[in-house]
C-alpha cells in the first residue's frame, strides 16, 4: 500500500519514464493499494491503467465525488467494490472482495484523516522532539495538540466505521491497509 502523493506528481526521469509506475510494476505484488493515486494532468489515469493492465492487474477504483478516489490493482479476481460510509470530504475507505482460490478475502484500502500539519508545524514538532526543554516547546506543543486533537476527533469515527464494516462482513480473511495518518509527520 502506498500514498503516492498524486503518483509522485507525474514526474518523469531523464529517460522520459515515470519512476513511480516502474516501481509499482517491478514490485510484482499481487495487490497494490494506492492513496492519493489520482494522476496529475500530465499523467492520465487511462495511461496508468493501461500500464497496470499490461502487467496483469485488474483495476478497481471508486470515485463517487464524496472523497478522493481509492485505487486497488489486483492480480486476484475482484468480486465487489464498496465505499465504507463515513463523514469526510477528502478521505475514504474502499472495501474490495477478492477471490483467492476458493476463498473470498476482504481487502480494505484506507486513507484516513491526516493531521494536516504544515511544513512549519512539522518543523515545530521536530524541534519539540529534539529539545523538549526549549523556550518554545510549551507554546508549540499546545498549538500542535490543538491541531492533532481535531484530526483525531475525525479519524476516530472513521476507524469505527471501518471496524463495523469488517465485523458485519463476517469474513475470516481480512486485509486492512492504507494511509492511516496516525503519525504527526505523515
What are these regions (language model features)?
Residues 8, 80, 184:
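Short beta->alpha connector loops of Rossmann-like oxidoreductase domains
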Amino acid at each position: 500500500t502506498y500514498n503516492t502523493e498524486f503518483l509522485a506528481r507525474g514526474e518523469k526521469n531523464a529517460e522520459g519514464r515515470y519512476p513511480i509506475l516502474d516501481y509499482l510494476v517491478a514490485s510484482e505484488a499481487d495487490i497494490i493499494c494506492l492513496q492519493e493515486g489520482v494522476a496529475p494532468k500530465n499523467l492520465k489515469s487511462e495511461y496508468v491503467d493501461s500500464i497496470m493492465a499490461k502487467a496483469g492487474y485488474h483495476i478497481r477504483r471508486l470515485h463517487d465525488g464524496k472523497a478522493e478516489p481509492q485505487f486497488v490493482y489486483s492480480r486476484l479476481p475482484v468480486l465487489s467494490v464498496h465505499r465504507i460510509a463515513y463523514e469526510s470530504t477528502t478521505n475514504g475507505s474502499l472495501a474490495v472482495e477478492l477471490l483467492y482460490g476458493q476463498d473470498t478475502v476482504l481487502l480494505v484500502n484506507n486513507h484516513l484523516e491526516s493531521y494536516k500539519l504544515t511544513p512549519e508545524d512539522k518543523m515545530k514538532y521536530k524541534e519539540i522532539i529534539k529539545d523538549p526543554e526549549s523556550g518554545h516547546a510549551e507554546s508549540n506543543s499546545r498549538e500542535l495538540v490543538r491541531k492533532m486533537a481535531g484530526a483525531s476527533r475525525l479519524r476516530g469515527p472513521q476507524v469505527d466505521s471501518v471496524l463495523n464494516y469488517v465485523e458485519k462482513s463476517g469474513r475470516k480473511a481480512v486485509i486492512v491497509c492504507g494511509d492511516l495518518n496516525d503519525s504527526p509527520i505523515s
